[in-house]
Amino acid sequence: MKKAGIFIIVICFISNLFAIDGLLSKSENLRIVKTQYFDIIFPEECRESAKILVENADKAYEELAATYEQPMLFRFPVVITPEEQMFNAYFSTGYYNRIVMYATTPDEDFNEFSEIFLSTFKHELTHAFTFNLRDKFWQVYSIMFGDNPTPTMIAITSGMAEGATVSYESKDGEGRINNEYTKHLLRQAKIEDDFPSYADVSCVAEKDPNANFYEFNGFFHDWLQKNYGMKKYGEWWYRQVNIQSLTVGGAFKKVYGFKLKDAWNQFAQEFEIPEICDDSVENGKIQDLFTPDSNVYSKENSSGNYFYFLTNTQKGIYFYKRGYIYFIDKNDLENSEIQAKKICSVSNVSNIRFSNDGNFAVITYYDLNAPTTKRKISIYDIQNKKNIRINKDAIKDGNLIKKDGEYYLVYTDFSSFNVKIKVDKVDFSNKKNFLTNVSEKVLNTEVNAYSYVDVGGGNFAFINKSKMNYSICVFDSECNLVKEYSLPLEKMDIRYLSFMNDNLYFSWANPGTMIRFGKVDLTNDIISLSNQNISGGIFYPVGLNQNEIAYIANFAKEYRLLKKQIQPETMQEFSVETIAMNNDDFSNEERTLPLELEGEREYKKYEHLKRGVLLPLGTVVSNSFGENGSSQIDLPIGISYITSNPWGGTAFYGSVGYGQGTNSVGINLGVQGGSDNTFFRYVIDNVTEFDKKGWKSASLALGLSSEISVLKKSAFAISNNSYGFIGKENNVNAKNSFGAYAPLTNDKYLYLENSTSFVYRWQESTGYSRYAKKGFAVGPSFLYQYLSKVTPVKKEYLNASRLGMQGLIMIPRLLPIKCKTGLTYNLPTTIRLNVLSPSATNYSIDSPGLVFGFFKDSAAFELASFEAQTVLFSSEIQKSIFGTSGLYLNYWTISFVYFGEFECFPEKNRSSYSITNIPYFVDLVKQNDVFYNDCAAVRFAFAFTPAIGGLANPANKIEMYLDLSLANVGTELLPQLKFGIKMN
């Protein structure tokens, strides 16, 4: 009884320690308000966001149910967290229905909403509603066993799921369906005659732009609803959710009476594109920025690249591509061939701006070295090649302005409840007090500021979005409004502001247009708007001179850097009034949090742990270790339960299972959790087993892991796994029958194992190909194992340790050639090396197994192994082979693989080795006691993804391969034909 009490205290301590982690790692004093359908959980600093949901969530649910003509069946928690600094939200059924909202300032990607937080909630609520369109059977199942597993896991693709959300979010005139920047992706695909099939946008594609399943499915589902009504659409969902048809296409045909493929083709045919002018590189009206004299695209513009953050400065043009900032000197812009210079590498980038003089890059990036994602800013001194990190988070979209020869940093600060525009004076010589705040302005509710640019004289301009209304504002360094330019056309959406020679440049669109170019003459207060629709659109326009711009064109499968002469007849001028007074969108006084909400109370940490997943089977495993070896035997007859807090930080699980083979009962209790990313994760797992003689065994496992980003493209990963067992040994040599595996004696054994690994890795992309990566990983690993009999007589069987080293090198190409998009033939190579890899004893939890299976001598000791794989040829497929369902083919590859291994037969009384024992192994070599076995193979492989239900995701990719190999084992050459499967 005393032991049981201690165990309960330990479990309570652990659960209390990790009760608030993950997405609420720093939040205390959680509050809850229960509405008719939702439990809204939030920390005090999110009370304003909570107020929005308390007032609107129930109504949003009722409207959604009325739209689908379905009853309201569920109630679940909604968590609001301020910890995640990248605006988003998600719905999950694990381990019960729940929505988590990130209460932070949004980026331009959410410009399609006037009430961004509420609209994002409605998007996730649509997921919750459609995923829970259950019939009576699944409703009873949910009551008995919980919300997960759910039939949607095998029935609904991500494409279908997002089709419902994107179409619903747009039903009232906002949302992505009504946004021209979103439409651009579909329009451009149709312009290029490259419109995908339905299966191609089911979320199985690996290549960029890999998020297009949102857009294509959203417009398709909107088309279905408008042409055939919501009743049929709801029936399609109902049928698919309840698995009344095996495939999405089968359910569609039952409801609509014709094939999904035919509906998709009709939708593609009817999708309208605006009239496009004939300007192109081919006819010389547009120029390739890298080869302006050529009528064909340059290598840079035809290699599947994606360019961002194009900026013109007094020194020249900067842009970002594949992890690097590049520069083109202004004196080189008229050359017939232009080579961009690589400036520096950057990672986890959110935004990059450049000072007008071209001396500094201001980088907004995501910091992953924290329990949740943080947004930070660094300033890169281009001339001195020095990166200066600002030591605070919750800041973004920074840029430098210059006044009287001194620099000021302007940025958005969302570190508190109030979102502010801030201006700080920069002192590069003072490392301790690098920034000094000089002014700030509070943004009022539903107001967002983007694209800060220096316009000279200590003033800066930015795009101001208030609900769905845009304007261009000019502030001075004291955050006083100097001018505000209203836009001349209705429903204009503007982005990507830049400045050159007293002119502001921007991208714009309004209903029915492609993405066009606009300009503001700050001297004469004239706005000029392009009246042309150009294939690829005009993104990130920058002025080269008064009549020429450079820009990024977004084509269907790559972006291109182009430039174009601006003809006066293609521009329409508007004289606009400017306002030089305080705007209601901004305030000098901070807003206050709302008072305590009606029904608000303190949230109890364990309030939702009673909700979870109940499984009518045991997940307990009977482990045993002894002089005859180790065993793992399932105890499947039983019951299991798993739950977590509503924000998914900590999961608790328990299982009771019985196995007829061991005639024993096991109890498994565990907890796992940590940060919301790879910064820190843990698992604690306990198994206690009983048989007819009473207590049989107990084990405890503890796993810890952490990955910390260092420098720019590298990371340091640490993991430690400890395991302890004490108890009786199963009869491991028995044949499976009732009680056959039960221990033959009452002898008890103690087994201990600890494995530790440290890995430093560096990697960067060198091209568009999946194999175009260079980098390395290296690190030591240590394994300790101990086994002894503890009763009735103590006897040691194993006391072994091994310290080894692993390494990996990725070479992007052996041939100095660039491959065409979608093909690989420049021989990328990966090399792996293991020296005294600590994983070879029979008692290791993770026994490795060799690559080709030739080397089978269990007495042999692996000193080192070497593997090299060279891709001879690879081709991307990225297409479905069965139309609307079936398999999605990713790629096929032919490669050459070589594997070699050094083995020895060490003295029997030696059980511990490390890389410090090199002299001992040298002696073995001298005595010819080291043997080398190797194998070479040609591997034919192709990868596919099941395009069915929740399996339709690149994470579920399967690679099938066939090896034609020849092995040298001792003095024999052994041919082998081997078929294998690898999964992500």
What are these regions (language model features)?
Residues 277-305, 329-350, 379-402, 424-451, ...:
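Multi-bladed beta-propeller domains
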Residues 178, 320-326, 344-348, 364-377, ...:
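A flexible loop/linker signature enriched in serine peptidases of the S9 family
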Residues 512, 537-539, 556-558, 678-747, ...:
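Outer-membrane beta-barrel translocator/channel fold
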Residues 25, 94-96, 109, 113-120, ...:
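Acidic/His/Gly-enriched intrinsically disordered linker/tail segments
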Residues 280, 294, 508, 560, ...:
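Outer-membrane beta-barrel initiation region
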Residues 22-23, 29-32, 211, 235-358, ...:
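Beta/coil-rich, acidic/histidine-enriched accessory regions frequently appended to metallopeptidases
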Residues 733-899, 904-932, 936, 971-973, ...:
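C-terminal outer-membrane beta-barrel translocator/porin domains of Gram-negative envelope proteins
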Residues 20-151, 165:
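Juxtacatalytic substrate-recognition/specificity segment
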